[in-house]
Amino acid sequence: MTHPVTPKNTTRPTPANKPAASTLHPRNPHQGRYDFDKLIKALPELEKHAITNPSGEATINFSDADAVLTLNKALLAHHYNIKYWDLPKGYLCPPIPGRADYIHQVADLLNNNNSGSENKKPHVLDIGTGASLIYPIIGSQSYGWYFTATDIDPVSINTAKAICEINPNLKKLVTVKQQKNPKNIFKGIIGEHDYFDITVCNPPFHGSMQDVLDANNRKQSKLQKNRARRNPNGQANKFADAKNNLNFGGQNAELWTEGGEFSFISRMINESVGYAQQVNWFTTLVSRAENLKPLDALLRKVGARQIKTINMQHGQKASRILAWRFK
């Protein structure tokens, strides 16, 4: 029997189900603070990680990789009916609220424009699904979409296949396919007779492993300064704001590519021209705002008929979706 969560070594926290001001998409179920009572009911093992922050609110230690992974398992179990989900050690553990926002935004894009396959469930192509399979999980369970999920990493592919195989609600909607040539994005994946309503992608952000390490050091330094400012008495504080995860890990292919984000998306744009009649909308996340202007120029150069930028804000983090089509 599962009892309401009482975080260890503390009194009962302030209820976590009071919604806070949110910039998430209105259909995103991850509004406000996490409801730990419901999450623990969905996944009892989360209870051992439950603690309170200095404000007396239920949370976890976001610098503990196992706690973060367990929280994600609980979120997927509670909101998306995923009974089995796990990651190989060192692989990217995604922030689910932000990933869900991308899916809900592209759902609006499909609803507001001719999807190209009327009266049929949309078929979505996920470029670089990773071991987490996060976009196919959210999209298939939120909207009933079909997904083809791709990656170049064999460990990610095998993990994603295992997640699909064990969860019947995914097995009938999600196909996992390995990209054999790391230089290609769509080639070798989109067959001659395939049609996709939309593509999604969270591209590698950095240009080298050194860039990854430097960025992580800057992030850790900033977090330590913020914690010190919040705790002027020097009291130990291992808490991070819920949903600002500092322990996501990640393999090389998930974190960096030669030339960084701009180079990867530029390759995607150039390659998309050859599939202009087989994909209704191409989309990708763009983390660096300064990349938008040159990417827009490239899209105009290759003949994109429609170009859209959809801004997203998750706490202190701003990102945007770049979408284009040739129809």
UniProtKB/Swiss-Prot annotation:
Q: Name one GO molecular function term.
A: 23S rRNA (adenine(1618)-N(6))-methyltransferase activity
Main location, first listed in the record: cytoplasm
Q: Which UniProt keywords apply?
A: Cytoplasm, Methyltransferase, rRNA processing, S-adenosyl-L-methionine, Transferase
Example GO BP: rRNA base methylation
E.C. code: 2.1.1.181
Q: Which InterPro entries match?
A: METTL16/RlmF, rRNA_lsu_MeTfrase_F, SAM-dependent_MTases_sf
Where does the source fall among the domains of life? Bacteria
Main EC class of this protein?
transferase
Swiss-Prot/TrEMBL catalytic activity: adenosine(1618) in 23S rRNA + S-adenosyl-L-methionine = N(6)-methyladenosine(1618) in 23S rRNA + S-adenosyl-L-homocysteine + H(+)
Entry's localization field: Cytoplasm
| CDD domains, per the entry | AdoMet_MTases
Give the HAMAP family listed for this entry.
Answer: 23SrRNA_methyltr_F (MF_01848)
* Stated name of the protein: Ribosomal RNA large subunit methyltransferase F
Organism, as annotated? Psychrobacter sp. (strain PRwf-1)
